[in-house]
Amino acid sequence: MDIRNEFLQFFQNKGHEIYPSMPLVPNDATLLFTNAGMVQFKDIFTGIVPRPSIPRAASSQLCMRAGGKHNDLENVGYTARHHTLFEMLGNFSFGDYFKEEAILFAWEFVTKNLGFKPKDLYISVHEKDDEAVKLWEKFVPVDRIKKMGDKDNFWQMGDSGPCGPCSEIYIDQGEKHFKGSEDYFGGEGDRFLEIWNLVFMQYERSNDGVLSPLPKPSIDTGMGLERVQALLEHKLNNFDSSLFAPLMEEISELTGLDYASEFQPSFRVVADHARAVAFLLAQEVHFNKEGRGYVLRRILRRALRHGYLMGLKEAFLYKVVGVVCEQFSNVHAYLKESKEMVMKECFEEEERFLETLESGMELFNLSLTHLNENKIFDGKIAFKLYDTFGFPLDLTNDMLRSHGACVDMQGFENCMQEQVKRSKASWKGKQNNADFSAILNAYAPNEFVGYETTECLANALGFFDSDFKEITEANPNQEVWVLLEKTPFYAEGGGAIGDRGTLFKDNEEAALVLDTKNFFGLNFSLLEIKKALKKGDQVIAQVSDERLEIAKHHSATHLLQSALREVLGSHVSQAGSLVESKRLRFDFSHAKALNDEELEKVEDLVNAQIFKHLTSQVEHMPLNQAKDKGALALFSEKYAENVRVVSFKEASIELCGGIHVENTGLIGGFRIVKESGVSSGVRRIEAVCGKAFYQLTKEENKELKNAKTLLKNNDVIAGINKLKESVKNSQKAPVSMDLPVEKIHGVNLVVGVVEQGDIKEMIDRLKSKHEKLLAIVFKKENERITLACGVKNVPIKANAWANEVAQILGGKGGGRDDFASAGGKDIENLQAALNLAKNTALKALEG
């Protein structure tokens, strides 16, 4: 049975609108990932946005529960039901039907469509929900209905937000399979398995814990697809179902092991984590040191460790990820389109971790022999595994699990000191929606006229302080927000900064517009008051001249993305952007740095479109029609049914609500000024056009003239070559080897800094001079510290030593056991690096 299609078809026949799965990265600052089907409907439930014309919805939503409040990562592989990524089937009512219909629909689908026997079904309800009990008694004997408290049967998304009592459908998997003392209905055992949760959304909980009735009672339900699939196939573990069979076969082929072996938990971890990695990478979450990217990194590294347990010492997960992409490509087409990029990025991240995995495992296994009688693992060692070898703390705890041990958390936290809690770094901060509820109830969305004009006459509907509390009057020197009846000011969005400008009253400057933002469909402008203004005042709103320069950079960004896709391939997609009056910044998915030839091609393509003077065209059309025309869209963006499409003839077509030039000739010229990496799999281009392009060219010409003067040569290249030759000749002079040499237990130890010379050559000379050697030499050059280290006839690995020291300098190293090099940009930490290098060597020699 195709459960997904069966579910959606059932509810479509019941008058529900079918919604696609929203991105795993939600447009919600309070959530790390989309963790439930109701996330995309949250603003409807709270009344922030109006309910849709069809007040019934159903979806099959991809969800992630790893990191943040809802975190199942540590349980995956050890239980029958936990997953990091799973699919949640759900039906929703926005003030339409309530408990009676929700219960009726659920019972019909479970018993008729899925075919579960009524005698095997049990129901839980909230202890105060007598109404639900009476409704269930129509289908289920009262002795199979159990009342439970808030802990089990009151659902809420977070500490605040929509919530309400819930009712759950359980299935008895059979007494013959479960003999534990907790295997009774309501117990902690697995015999009675929850399959569907019906939430009766009646309240909203405020930040201070107060429950308030929602505008209209609603329904939110959730049923795990993986769980239902296993039950229909009479499997007691989700991982034993046909959904996971292709992955288990691939893992078995890679390892040479049987799924039904002692390594079964590791099979399950790898299979689960491969799904999460595939979908997150395909949805443009990239490996990073913080936030969602760090959660992704933790998932991958946990999978690699379980692969290591099964004897896999080389990159392998990318192959399993490839199977995931193929398996789900018929439902999620983007997996097929991005398969090559996803596998490549996964492979490269695996290679990075495998460089340190072996050394980290050696340290871990050695430390296990020193466990105290309470089986507490040294927090300092756990921190070293985390900081030096890249082992996330939960990975170390996972490894300790089979030994009945755990990390000394106090010791770990002491070592961590006040480092940023990485897994929350990119999603902290909450918008207090309650503050806007009153505004949204009082004001309709204001009219934006900025596409047609940069100036208009408008009434000031209201003024608001920094907390968006309404004020009656705005006085000179205050900074306040204004809501205009209609506005020419474009609100920040699509990477473009918000418009600035001026408000005039009675032909006098009344306020400077510092910024413009959109909150829940209302365009607010931030003002610096020059002359007193009050609610109802009529003003002239005028956009500043920098609007045109912003438009130039915005249009250039569209041309840039098109050029990148032509030069690098269709896998390129936007990962972020910033559009200002003097520059643009564009982040995009690509696995490696662009070379000079590629950058030149991209720049030439953009300028070619500028010189063609292509006319811009703006159209409004249904979303599906726009996609059929080939319009580029942001994966993470949630679009309305009808969208605005901006095109420059054959050169570019994108979904965009921003301001653009009328024809590309107005852009003037385009120059790439920098290409860099943002994170694994994400590159960044910074560029200028328009006036900024002219100013850059002017400054470069001035510098060129100065260079000719300093070199005393009109041929700058020839002058530079002559200077380089002179420097090269001066460097050939022998460099003093005044490096301190200490003899420790018969080993010559050298730790020092030089001002000039080839430090690799110095290491070679030291190795030829001494029979037993530990040497590390630092050199400051080009605002960086570089280092080289050599080992001779001493049981210490140079690459591990160099890498550990490089961490303090903000870098990393690599090389062989007998020679390694490294570098970092944190020059101020040079003395600390010297101290660490020496202490590490001394500790090794004395140990």
From Swiss-Prot:
GO terms for molecular function: alanine-tRNA ligase activity; aminoacyl-tRNA deacylase activity; ATP binding; tRNA binding; zinc ion binding. The keyword Zinc applies. Keywords: Aminoacyl-tRNA synthetase, ATP-binding, Cytoplasm, Ligase, Metal-binding, Nucleotide-binding, Protein biosynthesis, RNA-binding, tRNA-binding, Zinc. One of its GO terms (cellular component) is cytosol. It is found in: Cytoplasm. PROSITE patterns: AA_TRNA_LIGASE_II_ALA. Zn(2+) binds at residues 554, 558, 656, 660. Its EC number is 6.1.1.7. Binds 1 zinc ion per subunit. InterPro entries: aa-tRNA-synth_II/BPL/LPL, Ala-tRNA-lgiase_IIc, Ala-tRNA-ligase_IIc_anticod-bd, Ala-tRNA-synth_IIc_core, Ala-tRNA-synth_IIc_N, Ala-tRNA_ligase, Ala_tRNA_ligase_euk/bac, DHHA1_dom. The keyword Nucleotidyltransferase does not apply. Pfam families: DHHA1, tRNA-synt_2c, tRNA_SAD. Belongs to the class-II aminoacyl-tRNA synthetase family. HAMAP family: Ala_tRNA_synth_B. PANTHER family: ALANINE--TRNA LIGASE, CYTOPLASMIC, ALANYL-TRNA SYNTHETASE. Consists of three domains; the N-terminal catalytic domain, the editing domain and the C-terminal C-Ala domain. The editing domain removes incorrectly charged amino acids, while the C-Ala domain, along with tRNA(Ala), serves as a bridge to cooperatively bring together the editing and aminoacylation centers thus stimulating deacylation of misacylated tRNAs. This is Alanine--tRNA ligase.
